[in-house]
């Protein structure tokens, strides 16, 4: 079983093969997802909401993410493992380097940062220090209070243009992957075409290079509500393994997400 690497993901984009991704937080589920053929696993700061029961992700610490990264890594043989850098753990380049080192030591193969051009120095510095970086634009949950809630981003022309330019700048600075969350399908498609790196969407329509969902949403077991962009695969299949396999299959063949799970301008 050949391991997924940054080179694998880039080749998948170049060959128009969709990338499948899910969040994971422990060894049991990471093993289950890995065995079904998931390409990417993200230890998301979403753990603050789905595991810790909080209303947002802001209370998650770097130690929380490192703990779950160690657990996830133990269940994985093939999938590419990414760890979120949580709120205020990367405010300065120096702080970013130290905290990224903790996540890489815990078993991550890449770290994910939320934000735009203010991160360029940190992105370049991480690359120089051997740490692969995933960017995250659109609805960045750590900025929920700035946005005034969990809202679709990039619907007006100015905001869309700014997001496109920031994606280009971050790619030039050295990110090797980009997550777009809750942005209109047209914008997500334009960004995916404008950068050479793989773009993975969540609530960003079918035109990105891949899809990611929070595992609890994909299984329909989130405590609060089911986001518009998600789909309850466990309800459809009645079995966790089959649910994961169907999710992967629908991402690969392009049937998920449909228009019903996407946002328009």
From Swiss-Prot:
Q: Does the keyword Cytoplasm apply?
A: yes
- Detail which positions bind 3-methyl-2-oxobutanoate: 45-46, 84, 112
Its EC top class is transferase
Q: Which GO terms describe its cellular component?
A: cytoplasm
Q: Does the keyword Zinc-finger apply?
A: no
Q: Which GO terms describe its molecular function?
A: 3-methyl-2-oxobutanoate hydroxymethyltransferase activity; magnesium ion binding
Chief subcellular location equals cytoplasm
Which residues are involved in binding Mg(2+)?
45, 84, 114
Q: Which cofactor names does the annotation list?
A: Mg(2+)
- Specify the pathway: Cofactor biosynthesis; (R)-pantothenate biosynthesis; (R)-pantoate from 3-methyl-2-oxobutanoate: step 1/2
Q: How does it assemble?
A: Homodecamer; pentamer of dimers.
HAMAP family listed in its UniProt record = PanB
Q: What does this protein do?
A: Catalyzes the reversible reaction in which hydroxymethyl group from 5,10-methylenetetrahydrofolate is transferred onto alpha-ketoisovalerate to form ketopantoate.
In Swiss-Prot or TrEMBL terms, this protein is called 3-methyl-2-oxobutanoate hydroxymethyltransferase
Q: Which organism is it from?
A: Pseudoalteromonas atlantica (strain T6c / ATCC BAA-1087)
Where is the organism placed in the taxonomic lineage, from the top? Bacteria, Pseudomonadati, Pseudomonadota, Gammaproteobacteria, Alteromonadales
